[in-house]
Amino acid sequence: MKTKAIFVIAAAAMVFSLASCEKIGPDEKPDGGDGSTSDTTVVSPGPSAGSDTLSGNVSGVWESGRTIFVDGHIVVPEGKSLTIEEGVTVIFSDAGVGVNHAAVEFSVNGNLYCLGTEEAPVRLTVAEELRTAANTFEGLWGGIVAGATCEEMLIDHTIIEYCGGQVIEGSPAAENGYYTAGDDAYPHITTNNVDGRYVITNSILRNGWSDAIYMMGGNAIIAGNIFSAIGYDGAEAVNVKSGCTVDVTRNIMFSANTNGLKLSSSDQSEVRHQAKIQAYNNTIIGSGWRRDGEKGGGIYVEENADAGVFNNLLVNCKFRATTPAWDEPGSEDCYDGEHSMIDYNYYASGTVESSIVFSGEYEDDGEMLLYSGVKFPYEGYAFNHEWYDAEKVDVHSVMARTAEEAASLDPKFVNFDLNMDPASYAFNDSWDFHLAAGSPALDASKTYTAGDRQPYFGTSGLEVNGQTYTSPAIGAWFGAFGE
């Protein structure tokens, strides 16, 4: 067995790795997964132009360096695979499909392998002239919808952007029962197979109306990614439901509208098992401020989710970890407080007032309530929120609750100033979220490393596309990176 490490230096000179074991032998399928070579779409260089326009069923290989224009829904059929090689740019039409202009959807009923590299990432995007700040939350195309028959998917060194078109009548996701027409918008990535295997790593998911990753089933490693400008009027960077077992680690989550992490076991049943999540060593920045009301803030755990949430570094978030109905154990809305461990996190705050502050009264289901009026992150951490489980959650966490504590607990990023508008969603590629020497967030004595909460896929890993990927080990520091 051949062993290799996958490294990334993304955006702000950030480095991480995932170990993988490449399987060499007669079972390896060089065509990308299903072993067949007939009835496929193989895009190869032509004599004149380095581009192609496609819609409908797609499979085979989109070869390195090509530009693919997509002007209608595309589908990887069940039993087929599509491999997108390094340097491929896929441009989705913003015109939509049909008389109702349904957002273009990338449906994956078979398997998908996006195999970018640090030097030549795969890019799923829109036309260059549409890649503007004004279109950050416009939802110009749909997103990837991995259906119930998608067995595996690898998203590696891939940029996915400007997603989030509305799901309407005629949208494949509505016709297939994954989303509701008129009520939902497309995430960047959706999963639906409780037995599926998904690895999303070294990638950038940005600029979208809805969630970045919405998991309704599957086993996943989500590691080493950058999420930024996620959600127009709601949404999370990573949203996990029942039927999922997931490791979420070493990610940067910047300006998720509501939360960096929403962990729920909603719709749990005999065929959709309890959601199990290990979320550790992530850096979550500026979550919750753009969400109307008091729901957003960074971490949200509900509805019987079994969650390990630890060694995360939350910076300039509106609130700390919230667990609705925490005082009603066993109720439908309460998280699995008996087995979960949401603790040993680090809450840092700048001292700049948010440009978005909700104060005064508001109506919720006919009831008049008061906004928190929180202006600074440290005020939100100190706020007497009804969803703070003071008995079990963040008991050992490090937390800035005053301006003075905010100054003393500055995590000292190599290149990121805490004293910026916490509601900002513009990501700067020069930022570096490594911790400088002497950072209090490097204090290993305050972290969690040796307990029962270990990565689900840290040893056995997940086999995808003939390789076994393992989750990174728990870091003895807070956040995605140490020094």
State what each model feature region is.
Residues S17-S20:
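C-terminal motif of bacterial Sec signal peptides marking the signal peptidase cleavage site
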Residues G25-E85, S93-G110, G116-T117, P121-E483:
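Extracellular beta-rich repeat passengers
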Residues M1-F7, E22:
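Positively charged n-region of N-terminal signal peptides that target proteins for export
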